[in-house]
């Protein structure tokens, strides 16, 4: 073979190898890029919903919001899934179909809601199917649809986004539950609203601040006692503990009883954290969106703890003696006071008065000394 032919074959071989390597490199890169992109999008599916008797849940009224129809009387109600997880619409009436995909953290609608509405939606999810599935009544479908109904009310302004979360328009509720229809959804809906309304409520005698004015325990002949009644009816959701082990706390119904066998210098703080629905600390609320499709949210997050505080004081007693004398000499006289671990000598003042402070309740003896 001639030298020129050998050179030509080598050049062709090198070119072929380069092309093969380029192809391998391309193939090795593409799957990674595809996986990364897919993880940022969720695929939508739907399922029909059923009540406790196995009946298909249907809309009762044709209704619209801002000129967009979101329900048709007699239409079967469906629920949304995003990659198999429960999802909730935040754009009622906007188109969304099985097989559509939405991008994670790309919902303009969610971003434009503002913090108050976003927090209210999360609270509805927490007291709704996402955070309280086990405590709500009804079928899973009824719980999910009740949660969806509350979310629609919040995002559209048909329910206020701050406590007490008052409803301003019943169109979404009536579309499903008018005239007592779909009672299972209505029951779960009312439970969700009740949870939201009372979420931040603390006992009537407590404060959300640590520096509230102290309340005083009174001596009843055996111990210091203070009984407080919670007119808000939420005491059962709080377990108060004392900053001083000598101060005991007990609860019976809506009454909190605080006791101490002895007086204590300074204030004692009682504190409690409310029992509210919680989810995993890693749980997140995620919004998915697409400019041409209906935006949704999935998941739920924990809210800030609801805390209550109560300051109390347990005052010491005192003894006051006023010395009188026929000769008018009352100043500078000495008396010994004993009892309850006290053995103290005191001297009368110019007006014949002795006052001993910070004494525990009990019996004391006084006698003059020379």
Regions found by a protein language model. Give the residues of each.
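C-terminal segment of classical bacterial N-terminal signal peptides
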Residues: 13, 26-35
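Short, surface-exposed polybasic-aromatic patches that bind anionic ligands, especially phosphate groups
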Residues: 38-198
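Acidic/charged, solvent-exposed loop-and-adjacent secondary-structure segments enriched in E/D, K/R, S/T
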Residues: 159-315
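Structural motif
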Residues: 228-232, 320-331
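Short, surface-exposed beta-strand/beta-hairpin micro-motifs centered on an aromatic residue
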Residues: 255-257, 351-358
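Short Pro-Gly-centered beta-turn/loop motif in secreted/extracellular proteins
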Residues: 263-265, 354-365
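A short, solvent-exposed beta-strand micro-motif common in secreted/extracellular proteins
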Residues: 268-274, 362-370
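Short, acidic Ser/Thr/Gly-rich low-complexity loop/linker segments typical of extracellular
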Residues: 340-355
